[in-house]
Amino acid sequence: MSQTHDLKTWPVYFDAVKRGEKTFEVRRDDRGFQKGDKLRLLRTREDKPHIVEHGYAIGAGPSHIIDKVITYVLTGGQFGIEPGYVVLGLGDPQ
């Protein structure tokens, strides 16, 4: 059964995903990410990472949230990726 993960994302990376230039995420492997899991990328301020832009807690606008699905999981400890990290392939939800 797939899970949904809310991930805070700095503007430079969020915007690159939004433009379609960045089709992956590098994350600490602390959530048991699996192929088919859903990601909600939340545009977050770099200077205050605990604050999600435009009040996510009370409903951020759609321009500050991107929904993606994990299409591939490359685990760390190989190919120069640190152990404890993953590279997640991102696709559009169906």
Outline where the language-model segments fall.
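Catalytic phosphate/metal-binding cores of nucleic-acid and nucleotide-processing enzymes, i.e., regions
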Residues: S2-Q94
